[in-house]
Amino acid sequence: MIVRNIGARLGRRALATPLSRASFPAQSRFLSQDNFTAPPPPPTNSKKQAAKTAFAEPTLEEQAEFYAESIEKHTPEFAASPAAEAWSAPSATATETVTTWDPSLVDEEALKLKQQIEAIPGNFKLFKQTKAQTQKLGAGVEVRYIPEQYLRNPPSDASLEDLMAAQAHMGHNTSLWNPANARYIYGVRQGIHIISLETTATHLRRAARVVEEVAYRGGLILFVGTRPGQRPIVVRAAELAKACHLFTKWRPGTITNREQLLGGVPLTVVDELDRPLSGFEDHLHDRRPLAPDLVVCLNPKENMTLLYECSLAKIPTIGIIDTNTNPSWVTYQIPANDDSLRATALISGVLGRAGERGQKRRLEAAQRGVVTWKTPADVQGYFELASARAADARRRQAQDNSVEEQKEKDTFLSEDALKAMFGGDARI
C-alpha cells in the first residue's frame, strides 16, 4: 500500500520517461545542425502510461544491461575480463533457454503437491496434539478473585497489587474532597481523586502494628462497621483478634454513659492464660462496665458520634479515611476507599491477623511466666480492699479466740487452786 501510494503520487516525476530533445531548443542547436521545419509532436504518455511504465516488469535485456553496469561499476577488474562481454547483451540462446517449456519441471511440481497433500493428515494430528498440550499456556482464564477469600483466609499483609485489585485507590469526586486529605491523594483521573497506594500500605502497616501491640498488652479491641455488607467483615476480624464487634447503629452514650446502657452486660475475670477466676461476683456487680482500649472503624463518616465519644474518653481509634472524610476524626488514619467492600475486607483482615499475632505472643509469654499486661486499677483496688477485709476478719477472729480461751480459764480452776481452796486433803 505504501509503495503503491508513493508511485501514484511521485511516479510521473521520478520514474517517467525522459523528455524529447525538442523540449530544449538550446541544447538541440548545440548537439545537432538539423533544422526542424515543424515542432515535434507533444508527448503522448499520460499519467496512466507513466505509472504503467514505472511499475512495468523489466525485460531480460534491461536486466542484463543493469547487471553489466553494476559489475563494471563495483568491480573494475571484472570489466576487463572476457566474461564481462557476456553481460553486455543477452544472446538468443539464453533467451530460448529461459523461455523453453520443460515438462520435467511440471512433474516435480506435481510430485511436491502430492507430497504436501499426503502430509496433511499427519500435520493435522500433530497440530491437535500440540494444541492439547499448550492450550493452557498463557491463555488460561484463572479465577483471581473470590468474594469470600478475605473472610476465609485473610492475608497478614497487603501488597500494592492487592490494594489496586481491591479498588482501594478510588476516591470520590473532586468536588467532594476534604482539603486535609491532600497529602494522601496521588492525582485526579476523570474527575475522581486517586489515593496513593504507597501511602495506604504504609499507614495500614502502622495500624496493624498498633493492633498487634494492643492485643499483646491484653487490651480490648472493638471493630465497628455499620454499612450494609460489612457484618461478616467485622465479625471475622473480631474472631481473629479475640475482640468485640459492632455491625448495627451505634447507641449514643455507650461509652460516656455506659453505666446505664451496659449495666447488665455479664463480665468475667480471667488470669494471664485466659482462665476464668471465681470469687469476683461482688466486684463484677459493683464495678463500672468496660470500655474498649482501641476502636477500629471501617466507616467513620456514619460513626461521628462514636469517634467523638472515644475522643472524650481518650480512646485511640483507627479508621479508613476516604477523600471526603475528615482525617482528624481518628488517631491512626488508613487512606483508602471505604465504599468498596473488597477494600474494607482486605484492610480489616490484615488488622484481624495483626490482633491474632498479638494474642499468640501474649499467650506464649504467659506460658513462660511473663505477664505482659497490668491488672486494672479497679480490680487492683478490689484486691486491696478484699485483702484488708480478710486481714480485719483474721484479726477479729484472733481476738474472739483469745476471749474464749480466757473464759475457759476462768471456768475451769486448776489443781493448785482447788488445794488452796479446800485444804491439802481435798480430792477431786
Swiss-Prot record:
For this record, the Gene Ontology CC terms, alphabetical, are: mitochondrial small ribosomal subunit
An example Pfam family from this entry, by short name, is Ribosomal_S2
Going by the entry's taxonomy, the superkingdom of the source organism is recorded as: Eukaryota
Chief localization = mitochondrion
Q: Where is this region: Disordered?
A: 30-50
Question: What Gene3D superfamilies is this protein classified in?
Answer: Glucose-6-phosphate isomerase like protein, domain 1 (3.40.50.10490)
Looking up SUPFAM superfamilies in the UniProt record yields: Ribosomal protein S2
**UniProt GO molecular function:** structural constituent of ribosome
Q: Which UniProt keywords apply?
A: Mitochondrion, Ribonucleoprotein, Ribosomal protein
Q: Which PROSITE patterns does UniProt cross-reference here?
A: RIBOSOMAL_S2_1
Q: What's any GO biological process attached to this entry?
A: translation
Query: Any idea where this protein resides?
Result: Mitochondrion
Instruction: Tell me which InterPro entries the record gives.
Output: Ribosomal_uS2, Ribosomal_uS2_bac/mit/plastid, Ribosomal_uS2_CS, Ribosomal_uS2_flav_dom_sf
PANTHER family annotated for this entry? 30S RIBOSOMAL PROTEIN S2 PROKARYOTIC AND ORGANELLAR (PTHR12534), SMALL RIBOSOMAL SUBUNIT PROTEIN US2M (PTHR12534:SF0)
Name the job this protein performs. Component of the mitochondrial ribosome (mitoribosome), a dedicated translation machinery responsible for the synthesis of mitochondrial genome-encoded proteins, including at least some of the essential transmembrane subunits of the mitochondrial respiratory chain. The mitoribosomes are attached to the mitochondrial inner membrane and translation products are cotranslationally integrated into the membrane.
Protein family (similarity comment): Belongs to the universal ribosomal protein uS2 family.
The cross-references to NCBIfam families, in alphabetical order and at most eight, read: rpsB_bact
Q: How does it assemble?
A: Component of the mitochondrial small ribosomal subunit (mt-SSU). Mature N.crassa 74S mitochondrial ribosomes consist of a small (37S) and a large (54S) subunit. The 37S small subunit contains a 16S ribosomal RNA (16S mt-rRNA) and 32 different proteins. The 54S large subunit contains a 23S rRNA (23S mt-rRNA) and 42 different proteins.
Instruction: State the protein's name.
Output: Small ribosomal subunit protein uS2m
Q: What is the lineage of its organism?
A: Eukaryota, Fungi, Dikarya, Ascomycota, Pezizomycotina
